[in-house]
Amino acid sequence: GFDKQKIKIEDFSLKPVEHHVWMNLIFVKLQNEYYDIKKTLTKIEKIISPIRFDQYSYHSRVSYKINCNWKIYMDNYLEGFHIPIVHPKLNDAINYKSYKTETFENFSLQWCHIKSQSSPYKKSSSNQKAFYFTLFPNILLNIAPGRLQTNIIEPIDALSCNVHFDYYFLDIEPNQISKDINFSEDIQNEDIDICERIQSGL
């Protein structure tokens, strides 16, 4: 057996993992580098108020293998000028003239008003806006009325990446959920096409 008096349990324990729970979402940091995710999420919470995700229900995950460097995908997400050209359905669903980009420490925000008559999202009298947050370096939060979509961009190698979409909904009918997911699928396929074209041209 072991001499309990000579063994220090703290020398053999698992390494502690820093984490933060925010509106039922769990953020985990494995590296020792300083990054105050709580500060970032508190700012985001104020921006999107009164929206809260505590009562949203997890629906599903859709993953995509994309033949481009992960930074190309991030750059495409952060640049909204291509929307009227690459995403005609999305352009019809939003008020592109209201589209704005704001930058903060460790995250950025793109947001715009939604055209309720042509939007695939839940109709909301209190909030008809779409929020697109980028959390450095590779987490995206896409927020529309009644829906949260998180994106995790996972590098594979210099020429490819995985992108994981996780859907959360608040009291939405199944047909409305299908409409939302199908709409996102169309937009994602358009983004995949342009990202892979950019990669092939580098």
Residue spans for each PLM region:
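C-terminal catalytic domain of Rieske-type non-heme iron oxygenases
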Residues: 20-202
